Design a protein with these regions (language model features):
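Active-site rim/loop-helix segments in enzyme catalytic domains that contact anionic ligands
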Residues: 1-84, 110-114, 146
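Metal-dependent de-N-acetylase/amidase catalytic core
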Residues: 12, 34, 56, 68-181
Length: 181
């Protein structure tokens, strides 16, 4: 879901010369109608292709729907954060619609908030989220769209429609011209 929620900002950071690491916590095993092991492989390939211009993702392979506030997951998250030693972390909001996103937000906050600044991305359709700042990603619109469309197993067009609406709305809040994201 990096492509939907964070791709624009991460692209900006990459273009200014920052080293970018992307970590995907869950395996995607329940994110589609195919519930076989092949779905995990498909989702991994889609993530690699979607993030190709940003970084090679690190996969933690925790089962979809099982990410939670437990000692093992805390350890895995903390180890991976310290392995890449980030200057900032971008993660999901604690108010996100998805239980794995909420769990990841909590785990990251507990693992890293005393060591590195954490930025929380917008929620799907902005529900229960009030931005503290806005980032113009208009120049990265096509890259974000292309990255989302790499996820063929998830009917990606619906997410493109949602991101266009959400990002247009946030741009309008800043009085940006029509066609801004």
């Amino acid at each position: 879901d990096i492509e939907i929620f964070m791709y624009g900002l991460i692209s900006i950071l990459k273009d200014r010369g920052d080293q970018v690491f992307t970590i995907i916590a869950t395996d995607g095993s329940k994110g589609g109608s195919d519930k076989t092991k092949s779905l995990i492989k498909t989702r991994k390939i889609e993530a690699i292709n979607g993030l190709k211009t940003l970084s090679k993702p690190i996969f933690l392979d925790i089962s979809d729907g099982e990410l939670g506030d437990n000692i093992n997951h805390k350890k895995i998250i903390k180890q991976n954060i310290f392995k890449v030693s980030p200057d900032i972390i971008i993660t999901h909001s604690k108010n996100d619609y998805h239980s794995d996103h909420r769990a990841l937000s909590l785990l990251i906050r507990e693992a890293a908030s005393h060591y590195v600044p954490i930025l929380y991305c917008d929620t799907l359709m902005g529900v229960n989220f009030q931005p503290n700042f806005y980032v113009d990603i208009t120049n990265y619109y096509q890259g974000k769209k292309d990255a989302i469309l790499k996820h063929k197993s998830q009917n990606p067009e619906r997410f493109v429609d949602l991101f266009e609406l959400m990002n247009s709305y946030r741009a309008a809040q800043c009085n940006a011209p029509k066609g801004s994201y």
